[in-house]
């Protein structure tokens, strides 16, 4: 499943398997190489999706609500895993989320979109060093600004 894109590119079988195993190791699933999708948890499926994307060596990785269906604990683990993988791969990641906390934890820059018509409402740089403390005063200030931006379409902050 992970190496299907490489097969379409005509990459030889041995090289495909080698690269697939490399990315399975990166996402911590090397022990599950022979498992079928229905045998994997939600978090494992998300890791497979990340490996499948990265094995194709994209310039940027687009992730649209990838952790939205996960429970809170698995979501937090996957956020940390994504940051670890990002540190290794140094790829641009465009991450769409409705979770303010997730955006602050993961992003270097947050782009807030308005409601209909969708347009850029605000661009907020996140100058907080990693690892980030999700409850720090710096995070709280940014969270307040974002929530105010989001509410301002309805109310004045």
Regions found by a protein language model. Name each.
Residues 35-38, 56:
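Conserved signature/switch motifs of ABC ATPase nucleotide-binding domains
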Residues 1-7:
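Q-loop/switch helix immediately C-terminal to the Walker
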Residues 61-64:
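Catalytic Walker B motif of ABC-type/P-loop ATPase nucleotide-binding domains
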Residues 50:
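Hydrophobic anchor residue at the start of the ABC signature
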Residues 7-10, 14-31, 84:
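Conserved ABC ATPase "signature" region
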Residues 115-145:
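Conserved beta-strand-loop-alpha-helix hinge in the C-terminal portion
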Residues 75-89:
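Helical segment within the ABC ATPase nucleotide-binding domain
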Residues 91-96:
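Conserved H-loop
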């Amino acid at each position: 499943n992970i190496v299907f894109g490489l097969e379409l590119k005509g990459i030889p079988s041995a090289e495909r398997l080698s690269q697939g195993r490399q990315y399975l190791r990166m996402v911590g699933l090397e022990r599950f190489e022979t498992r079928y999708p229905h045998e994997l948890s939600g978090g494992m499926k998300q890791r497979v999706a990340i490996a499948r994307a990265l094995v194709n060596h994209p310039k940027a990785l687009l992730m649209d609500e990838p952790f939205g269906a996960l429970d809170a604990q698995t979501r937090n683990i996957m956020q940390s895993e994504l940051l670890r993988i990002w540190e290794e791969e140094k790829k641009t990641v465009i991450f769409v989320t409705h979770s303010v906390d997730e955006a602050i934890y993961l992003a270097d820059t947050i782009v807030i979109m308005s409601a209909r018509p969708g347009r850029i409402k605000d661009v907020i740089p996140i100058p907080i060093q990693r690892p980030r403390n999700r409850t720090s005063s710096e995070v709280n200030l940014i969270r307040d600004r974002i929530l105010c931006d989001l509410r301002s379409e309805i109310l004045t902050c």
